Amino acid sequence: MLTFRVIGDWDEDAVRVSWTASRLASNPRVERLIDTAWAGARQRKGIQLFDGPMCRLESFSATPTSLDLHVSRTSYRTFLGTNMSLGVVGSFGPSVLANPIGLSTSMQSSDGHLLLGRRNEAVAYYPGRIHPFAGAAEP
């Protein structure tokens, strides 16, 4: 299910991002799950992996005139092993999730069509699927 935590129309200077200490919870069992997920993805033929840096959303505050994002560092490897692994939240709770900030956009052509892309076959999740143009916030 898609959940929007906040929706608004903020000017560029009304959006502020600040670094904060990570509250990502971990333990040896979660680290083993991350290792296992990463090793499994690496073994899939044709998949290209890069453990790139990402911004984890720690908290936010929003008003009609401002949006403050408080972020910490996480990585693609942690994202793959937590957010993309079934059962992690049920077993360990949401505090173990990488929770990177995802960015998506929608574009409408002048003749009224919605522009979408097809994900590359070499990505670790949802390969070949139709998808909005998207990515993740990086430090």
Task: Name these PLM-found stretches.
Residues 1-139:
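N-terminal leader/linker segments that precede catalytic domains of diphosphate-processing enzymes
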